[in-house]
């Protein structure tokens, strides 16, 4: 897209961008750390965006553990996107499905 990523240290800019997207009529917000990122979107960012917006919130990039996935859900993500990790470790898919089901039934 040739867009410039916002640094995770600038939570205010990220929140304001998400608010602007919602005000412009976007149907969802996707917080993306980058495909195969070393560090996922922080819980603080997810929480801050969730508190200021009401559209569905998707979070992805850099999620490689079930803990990172459930942390994203706890922080306010409606959907967690995991891609590259499963390309390299498809055998872990059942673990993530079980963790998501366990989280959803709490």
Where do the language-model regions lie?
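Alpha/beta enzyme core
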Residues: 1-59, 64-106
